[in-house]
């Protein structure tokens, strides 16, 4: 059984715990952290499918900067901003950086779950395209493999 992994990043501890518990209740593997820095550390250790990310987090890096760094660590992770402070500027900047969507807090699970399902599908589609592309760039020759992407021979 495939377990989808969701990381919730929010400085409001009560909100964070509530969302994580509700996601786990629905069979998702959910993790919660209170800062952008903690999220980046977790992403270095654990593969995540979707990140629910607050934009305004005091005392450290904000959601926009966290998103910039997320895309360097796990470029295929889908990011949905969950925020009470969405502005047109932050929405545009987030979308340019690769955010999948924005939801305004308080968010209802009836609204969040379809967005998560769509984000999982999108991530899976991206992964399948990459796998397909990598397979298509390999040519098998007796005794060796030639990788068209790197233009070099690889031993079996």
Spans of model-derived segments:
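Conserved acidic segment of CheY-like receiver
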Residues: 3-14, 19-23, 51
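Active-site residues of response regulator receiver
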Residues: 10, 54-55, 83
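Short hydrophobic/Thr-rich beta-strand motif most characteristic of the beta2 strand and flanking loop
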Residues: 27-35, 42
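Short amphipathic alpha-helix used as the core "switch/output" element in two-component signaling
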Residues: 41, 61-75
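Active-site beta3 strand of CheY-like receiver
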Residues: 46-52, 57
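C-terminal output helix
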Residues: 107-117
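CheY-like receiver
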Residues: 122-156
């Amino acid at each position: 059984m495939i377990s989808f992994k969701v990381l919730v990043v929010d400085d409001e501890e009560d909100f964070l715990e509530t969302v994580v518990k509700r996601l786990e209740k629905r069979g998702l593997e959910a993790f919660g952290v209170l800062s952008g820095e903690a999220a980046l550390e977790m992403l270095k250790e654990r593969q995540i499918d979707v990140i629910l990310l607050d934009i305004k987090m005091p005392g450290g890096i904000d959601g926009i900067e966290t998103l910039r760094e997320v895309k360097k660590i796990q470029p295929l992770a889908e990011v949905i901003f969950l925020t009470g402070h969405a502005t047109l500027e932050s929405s545009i900047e987030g979308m340019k950086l690769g955010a999948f969507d924005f939801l305004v807090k308080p968010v209802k699970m009836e609204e969040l779950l379809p967005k998560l399902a769509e984000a999982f599908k999108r991530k899976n589609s991206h992964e399948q395209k990459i796998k397909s592309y990598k397979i298509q760039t390999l040519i098998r020759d007796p005794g060796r493999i030639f990788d068209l992407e790197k233009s070099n021979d690889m031993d079996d």
